[in-house]
Amino acid sequence: MFDFFISLINSAIYGLYNVTVAIGFPSYALAIIFITIILKVLLYPLMAKQMKSMMNMQEVQPKLLDLQKKYANNPEKLNQEMAKLYKEYDVNPMAGCLPMLIQMPILIGLYTALREYQFEPIEHATFFWVNNLNAPDPFYILPILVGISMFLQQKASMGKNNEAMENNQMMKTMLYIMPPMMVFVCLALPAGLCLYWSIFSLLGIGQQMIMNKQKEKQMAIIEARRAEEAAKKAEEEEERKKRQ
């Protein structure tokens, strides 16, 4: 099954390389960039669904806190009510992991394919200072670019909640430990894979900025709903006191 996946990647590289030949700019590096753009477009619906699920999770947070207080001594009932609430608001707690789970086999497949790919002619398998996309970047520029672009993408994903997000231990790890670790890992990886990864992250920054604007609009709607619900509860409480 994995061999078929690698064969598919090889075919995509060769097919898109032929496209670059047809447009008069034969380049395997450009073919890899095309693959990156195509994958980013294909994965966008998952990213959008992830953002929607996160927004729904924020909307449902006050109700979750109420349930946790109500069923503090009944974990089984709490889990049942939380499941109902997630279903009602279309929340998937695992939605944030899905894009990464899909991305990992793609990275492994690209690593295997690029390590063994026979670039012909080899002079078309260059990228500025890189003489061979099969080999590691001799000047470590692409690995460093991977780290920087990953850091910036994580920063962009925090939106305007930087301080709150940075206080989260997991987010701290993702933001400050993962990028340097990826730089170290990428030092030994084929330059073609580092090119894919850095372009994917750079595109992700632009994508995240667009999604952040959508998120701000959605958050404004959520805050308006919360204010409306709070006003309604206060009104009901006032009526109850009057009846007493």
Specify the residue positions occupied by each region the protein language model found.
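Helix-loop-helix
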Residues: M1-Q244
